[in-house]
Amino acid sequence: MTVEEFLERPERWDGNHEELIEGEIYLSPNNKPRHNIVVDRIQERLQPLKKQGFVVLGEVACRVSDSSLPNTDVAVIRQDRWEANGLDNFLPESPALVVEVASPNQMRKLLNKAALYLEYGAEQVWIAYPQKRVVQVLSADGSREAREAETVEFHGIVIPVSEIFPA
């Protein structure tokens, strides 16, 4: 299925939380409070990126290919790219940084999404695992896990992993 076919479906707008990944539709459950807290904490700590010409967004759909329109939990995109696209559309490309907060049983889907984001231009993808209190940092150079006593970094903004997850 293409992005156009996905968007033209009448049932697309019935309130389901769905996304298109490599031509397949994935439904996601409603986010739990812990998920939302982690998203909020990450967004808050990324706000200094605004001074570097970035926009920090919450959930947003990103068209990364003709057959993929995944949703991010947090997206960081350059201000000029955001303004060129307009404020009422999905992003036409992969953000510079994508953050996904993992829910149980989502590992395969999140790794597929991360590979897509990186293939289509993301500098980094962070996958936060609240149950393990770990952030997996993926980039074109490889992958590493940042544990609670460690930090994650994007364009000079350093975030202690311990500040991301609620007690």
Predicted regions and their residues:
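Gly/Pro/Ser/Thr-rich low-complexity, intrinsically disordered segments predominantly at protein N-termini
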Residues: 1-167
